[in-house]
């Protein structure tokens, strides 16, 4: 079992938390799966509103400009020809959705990989609560400084304990995003340098991942722990 320190918002250790090796061990990192998850996420963000005019949409008559033979000029059927200026575009882009189906098991596997990677790099922090007595942006900035957040950070809170004061206090922090435990995505964990979870949020995520993890892998991890013990 991986043991993680639980801090308060002042950066002081107030406890510890054990995380299953089957979910958070460094050997759980699957870079290929992370790449697939990020590719799918970024594809789903594309608007897909690009469009070029087809033959029926460009302006111009459909009348043949001159007879087929006898003029010495190249044959032409319409002023809207794609070979001519102001003509239509052949096989041009049309509005479409770039989203595609991505299996839930693969998404959860990518989430396990992202969490294991953050934990192995020492970039995952667990706090007892993200709430502050005076939930102002300035106080949250000072708290993040005490937690040694120098660049960007992802704050993850339990959906059942999220308060409006936390949302208002964190929304104006530069380089900081607040998400719920049931909407955190592998892309978010890779995008931000630090990941700060409330204890309730990381416990909920660990429980969800354990329910959906392979029973074979869990059994193998448990056997490995017994051998080490």
What function would you assign to each model-found segment?
Residues 52-91:
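Glycine/serine-rich anion-binding loops at beta->alpha junctions
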Residues 1-47, 93-229:
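Extended polybasic, low-complexity segments that bind anionic RNA or targeting/receptor surfaces
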């Amino acid at each position: 079992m991986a043991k993680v320190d639980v801090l308060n918002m002042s950066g002081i250790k107030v406890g510890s938390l054990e995380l299953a090796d089957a979910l958070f061990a460094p050997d759980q990192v699957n870079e290929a799966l992370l790449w697939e998850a990020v590719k799918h996420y970024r594809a789903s963000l594309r608007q897909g509103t690009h469009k070029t005019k087809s033959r029926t949409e460009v302006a111009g008559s459909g009348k043949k400009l001159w007879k087929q033979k006898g003029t010495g000029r190249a044959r032409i059927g319409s002023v809207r020809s794609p070979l001519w200026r102001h003509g239509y575009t052949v096989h041009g882009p049309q509005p479409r959705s770039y989203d595609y189906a991505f299996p839930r098991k693969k998404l959860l596997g990518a989430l396990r990989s992202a969490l294991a990677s953050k934990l192995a790099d020492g970039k995952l922090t667990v706090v007892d609560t993200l709430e502050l007595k005076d939930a102002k942006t300035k106080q949250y900035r000072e708290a993040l400084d005490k937690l040694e957040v120098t660049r960007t950070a992802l704050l993850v809170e339990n959906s059942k304990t999220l308060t409006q004061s936390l949302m208002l206090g964190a929304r104006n922090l530069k380089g900081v995003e607040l998400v719920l435990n049931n909407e955190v995505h592998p892309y978010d964990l890779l995008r931000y340098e630090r990941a700060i979870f409330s204890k309730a949020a990381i416990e909920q995520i660990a429980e969800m991942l354990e329910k959906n993890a392979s029973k074979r892998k869990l059994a193998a991890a448990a056997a490995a722990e017994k051998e080490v013990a």
